Regions:
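Catalytic-loop of the protein kinase fold
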Residues: 209-219
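Broad phosphate/nucleotide-binding scaffolds in NTP-utilizing and phosphate-metabolizing enzymes
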Residues: 1-204, 211, 225-231, 235-243, ...
Length: 373
């Protein structure tokens, strides 16, 4: 399910003749999974909230409203009259994820042969740590509450307030709005642009405002509210960044925008993106990062499926020397979730075909990356 949700974002990179038949099926993975029977739901609620769990609600819908990843969501009304979303973890989901991770770790040596530039051990350790957090809804509640406090009065971004939580149940304020998948499918260009810019602003600002980076960007986790704000859901996967975005990340972005291939290469070496025993052409490294920096080179930029397909074809063409770079670069563990967010949001923006001043938005929050005039 987690893989399917990630894949549904990157359908934008597929050629249209292949993407079209899969688009609707993949998008369903962002919000759909087989629902739990009501009796199982009641059993989980009784175990987590107590046998008198119904006393907490004035109403509770037994039929799940949405299902995704490791849990499902029920609509209810809390005892104080607040409309709430009740997220219930599938029984056995935590054990299944850990089992899957153990299977992946068995193949880590093979991955190392395919990707000789990558140090697999710290990546596996980071993945394990994040999975342990993601299956504990108390971690999620903590992250969501921090973001709610940071964005409580924000004109563009809405975070649902946490009502109560246990390790397996999370009760939050209900957010009404148009699912981002619907905006992608039939939204106006104004809606598409607004959604893209608001999501960009959220990810640019969250580390400095909340000390976190929401690290599960797929359309099922966003809603466009009637008042124009973007609603953000599911804080199970978050990167704790108490000092904001890492300075090395911003430095590398600046070197790329300056077209300073040597400084970029030196930074990659220093920060572990290129292992000591690996030697690559600095100019090819710079060229490989075009999808990251091109949207920040012009006053406005329009993301599109065609653009993403072109970029994917360029770095995936074995005849192109740039394609080999992806197999030679390392991904330090502390950048795994930042990379996930960068790739995921790029896919979303291309699905939306969003257009806007992404460069100016980035410079508001990261003025130090401004290229040398």
């Amino acid at each position: 399910m987690k893989f399917g949700q990630a894949l549904s974002v990157f359908e934008a990179a597929l050629p249209e003749e292949f993407a079209k038949p899969y688009r609707e099926t993949l998008t369903k993975l962002q919000e759909s999974a087989p629902p739990l029977p009501a009796k199982v739901v009641h059993k989980v609620l009784a175990k987590e909230l107590g046998d008198d769990w119904r006393d907490n609600f004035t109403s509770f819908e037994d039929q799940a409203t949405a299902s995704a990843s490791i849990g499902q969501v029920h609509r209810a009304v809390w005892k104080d009259g607040t409309d709430v979303a009740v997220k219930i973890q599938y029984p056995g989901a935590a054990e299944a994820l850990v089992s899957d991770l153990n299977q992946i770790q068995r193949f880590s040596k093979i991955f190392g042969l395919v990707l000789p530039g990558v140090d697999m051990k710290p990546l596996m350790e980071e993945l394990r740590a994040r999975i342990i957090e993601e299956v504990d809804y108390l971690y999620e509640a903590e992250a969501q509450s921090a973001c709610y406090t940071a964005y409580e009065n924000d004109p563009d971004i809405a975070i649902p307030r946490v009502v109560t939580a246990t390790t397996k149940v999370l009760v939050s304020q209900w957010l009404d709005g148009k699912p981002l998948a619907d905006v992608i499918k039939s939204g106006t260009q104004k809606e598409r642009n607004a959604a893209g810019m608001h999501i960009a602003r959220f990810h640019f600002t969250c580390p400095d405002r909340a000390g976190l980076l929401h690290a599960d960007p797929h359309p099922g986790n966003f809603r466009l509210l009637e008042d124009g704000r973007i609603g953000v859901l599911d804080f199970g996967a978050c990167n704790r960044l108490p000092d904001g975005f890492p300075e090395p990340f911003k430095n590398l972005l600046k070197h790329a925008l300056d077209d300073n291939a040597q400084a970029l290469y030196d930074g990659f070496k220093k920060d572990g993106f290129i292992l000591p025993e690996v030697d690559v052409d600095p100019n090819l490294v710079l060229e490989y990062l075009v999808p990251l920096v091109e949207p920040l080179r012009t006053p406005t930029f329009k993301y599109s499926r065609d653009w993403l397909r072109d970029q994917s074809a360029r770095v995936g063409d074995p005849r192109n020397p740039t394609a080999k770079i992806g197999f030679q670069l390392n991904l330090p563990a502390e950048y795994v979730l930042i990379h996930r967010v960068t790739m995921g949001t790029t896919g979303i923006f291309c699905q939306l075909e969003a257009e806007g001043p992404f460069r100016d938005e980035a410079l508001v929050w990261f003025p130090e990356i401004a290229p040398v005039a």
